[in-house]
Regions:
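Hydrophobic alpha-helical transmembrane segments of multi-pass membrane transport proteins
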Residues: 31-38, 42, 70, 90-109, ...
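Hydrophobic transmembrane alpha-helices of multi-pass small-molecule transport proteins
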Residues: 67, 139-161, 210, 270, ...
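Hydrophobic residues within alpha-helical transmembrane segments
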Residues: 27, 31, 58-62, 94, ...
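Hydrophobic/aromatic residues within transmembrane alpha-helices
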Residues: 46, 55, 106, 133-135, ...
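Transmembrane alpha-helices of multi-pass small-molecule transport proteins
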Residues: 2-10, 47-98, 124-130, 183-191, ...
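Specific alpha-helical transmembrane segments that line the substrate/conduction pathway
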Residues: 54-65, 104-138, 181, 263-281
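Membrane-interface interhelical linkers
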Residues: 1-34, 63-91, 104, 138-145, ...
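Membrane-helix interface residues
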Residues: 49-51, 110-111, 137-139, 199-200, ...
Length: 312
């Protein structure tokens, strides 16, 4: 990713500017998507009285603090970076908070399937547009084609069961909230990629942003019911979401951003609903219609276009 910050000359040769190698860029991004794909299965095991926003807030507090406390560069990053970069960290933290606070309220209005498609499908588009507007690089034809395939496959995969059953009425507020969650994801992915391209350590960037987000989201957790956290099931769900789908996944995601542009990364994470669908079939005894399996194949083709090396 081209660096547009007031960065030293070493940023011109940042790894993000070189072609992504599968082992250092796409594979960590895909691994993070695999971990995120367990979110739905894990959250479905939460106690019945646990609000979705509280589950998301608790996971963000735990995972965000782990990302911040386990990397010393995250502690010092706000002090050593410039004023402009500090503001980027603040905006990134707000965007991190914005994702669960818009996505989870969208789910009861539009359903899990529609919310997932809108949020994940819009994120690569927002990332490409924002990256172009902020002069972080114009998306190429390969990215556009792969993203179109991946978004189409994601939509058919996730919406297949609802299309087969007649679907439900569209809730415009739910659609808007889901789109805002996609925008939030795009914003903090771009900011993280920009800071990493400027030479900042990936673990420090993710730790600083998510640590700030953990502090910002604390009131949401404190003002909601917390009794469910004391049950073994509730604690287990939050441990999985906080440690696996937040701490480990975003540590991998940040490492991948060092070698992969944010535009490509947000497209690759469309693998998340594929993982969720397979887990639903394997662990929850769910059934997918033929259309969903076709969508899974199209999605895999789009991801392969981005992941496989170019022909020389």
């Amino acid at each position: 990713m081209p660096n547009r910050l007031s960065a030293p000359a070493r940023a011109r040769s940042t790894p993000a500017a070189r072609p992504a190698r599968p082992g250092t860029g796409p594979l960590p991004i895909l691994a993070s998507a695999l971990l995120w794909g367990t979110t739905g299965t894990a959250s479905s095991l939460a106690p019945g009285g646990a609000p979705a926003t509280s589950i998301g807030a608790a996971a963000l507090v735990l995972g965000g603090l782990l990302l911040f406390l386990t990397d010393r560069t995250a502690w010092s990053l706000p002090r050593v970076c410039g004023v402009r970069e500090r503001w980027l960290l603040v905006v990134g933290a707000v965007a991190v908070v914005g994702y669960p606070l818009t996505f989870y309220p969208a789910v009861p209005r539009t359903g899990v399937a529609v919310s997932t498609v809108i949020a994940l499908g819009s994120a690569p588009v927002f990332t490409g547009l924002l990256g172009w507007l902020t002069r972080q690089g114009r998306p190429g034809g390969r990215w556009a084609g792969a993203t179109a395939l991946a978004v189409l496959g994601c939509g058919v995969l996730v919406l297949g069961p609802e299309l087969a059953g007649g679907g439900r009425a569209v809730d415009l507020l739910g659609v808007l909230l889901a789109a805002l969650s996609g925008l939030s994801y795009a914003v903090y992915s771009l900011i993280a990629g920009r800071l990493i391209a400027a030479g900042r350590p990936s673990a420090g960037v993710m730790g600083a942003m998510f640590g700030g987000a953990a502090v910002l989201v604390l009131p949401v957790l404190a003002l909601g019911p917390v009794g469910w956290l004391l049950s073994p099931r509730g604690a287990g769900v939050v441990l999985h979401l906080g440690v696996v789908t937040t701490f480990l996944a975003y540590r991998l995601f940040g490492h991948g951003l060092r070698h992969t542009s944010a535009q490509t990364a947000t497209t690759l994470t469309l693998a998340e609903p594929a993982v969720a669908a397979v887990l639903g079939v394997a662990a929850l005894d769910e059934r997918l219609p033929a259309a969903s399996w076709c969508g899974l194949a199209v999605l895999a083709a789009g991801l392969a276009v981005l992941t496989l090396p170019r022909r020389r």
